[in-house]
Amino acid sequence: MQKLEVFGAKKLRGQIIISGSKNASLPILAATLLTNKKVYLKNLPKVKDIETMIDLLKSLGSKIKYIKKDLIIDNSKQNKKFASYKLVRTMRAGILVLGPLLSKFGHAKVSLPGGCAIGTRPVDIHLKALSKLGVSYKISQG
């Protein structure tokens, strides 16, 4: 087994600020649809998928604003039940709004996500979970 040994005369001190996790942030952003109260989020990473999810929430009627580096999401007037392909096609995480919309409104329409650079990642696990909860669904074109 290889190892890296570091020799130095000084103790390491200080602080670093790490970015939040994209894969943790995306489901949290989708879950904000479940409440009509304001949600305050800190330390979201500045990556394209997060920006796209924020745009998707806005398209569903969420009011979103930044105060410094914090994000405030207000879904008190969120009333749309359709997640368009234009936004969902660019990230796999778009499917994550399906459950919250279904819970909130009793029905929802979410375009299936587009392709993925790292290969096929079907959404069937989401559909199977919904079926086990008694949800019926239809997949159609357009």
Language-model segment annotations:
Residues 1-142:
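Structural preference for solvent-exposed beta-strand-turn elements
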